Amino acid sequence: MGTTGTNDGATTPPANTSTPAVDIDVRDLGTVDYEDTWHLQANLAAQRAEEKIPDTILLLQHPPTYTAGKRTQDSDRPTNGLPVVDVDRGGRITWHGPGQLVAYPIIKLADPVDVVDYVRRLEQALIQTCEDLGLHGTGRVEGRSGVWLPAGVINGELKPARKIAAIGIRVTRGVTMHGVALNCDNTMEYYDHIVPCGLADAGVTTLTEELGRDVSVSDAYSSLAHNLVDALNGDLPVHS
């Protein structure tokens, strides 16, 4: 995904990415069933399209759940027999569960709708959250969604590029659904049974794994909430 850059690598966020520019309602849902939350999102998105509610961000965790986006291949699906929820977001298969902080922004994008700009803002919020928590060097990988750590030698071991946060969205009637998932201190066990996001040549990691100390969902919560609001309001510059 491309952006129009300035000389320092930052972009000037357009003023009309979402409306209103302020007044985003952030809701903490705790741990909630995936399908129940999916239905809640659809209900809120319909209300947002009719201007009945303000822009809203849902912050939560899910019980262990595999979800498959519209591009999921049969070969991506789990080998451990666990059920999969087929959903209407983009992307392929992923896992949600305890220790992973999930955010679902229900945002009315301004016309003309710019989905690339919206995704860039989500990525920037995640990158800044990692920085806030002491994890430096996260960024984007061309042609792949989400937030990544680059391949490299760490403690004498060659590690592949590793995804620390996933993004999958849907836009209907100009309103966003689904969103982002930041791996904090969740288990990696469930990823062993799928091809996460359809990427067989890449790894998955957590804040806890990379920082060598426990980083819980509660540790990341305030930072991610703040950075999402700032990114969506245009107060957090988007860097290429």
From Swiss-Prot:
Active site: 197
Site (Lowers pKa of active site Cys): 163
Localization (cell): Cytoplasm
Annotated spans, Disordered: 1-22
UniProt entry keywords in alphabetical sequence: Acyltransferase, Cytoplasm, Transferase
EC code: 2.3.1.181
Major site of localization recorded for this protein: cytoplasm
Alphabetized Pfam families for the sequence: LplA-B_cat
Keyword Transmembrane (UniProt): no
Broadest EC class assigned to this enzyme: transferase
Recorded metabolic or biological pathway in which this protein acts: Protein modification; protein lipoylation via endogenous pathway; protein N(6)-(lipoyl)lysine from octanoyl-[acyl-carrier-protein]: step 1/2
Annotated family: Belongs to the LipB family.
Function of the protein: Catalyzes the transfer of endogenously produced octanoic acid from octanoyl-acyl-carrier-protein onto the lipoyl domains of lipoate-dependent enzymes. Lipoyl-ACP can also act as a substrate although octanoyl-ACP is likely to be the physiological substrate.
Record protein name field: Octanoyltransferase
Organism this protein belongs to: Corynebacterium jeikeium (strain K411)
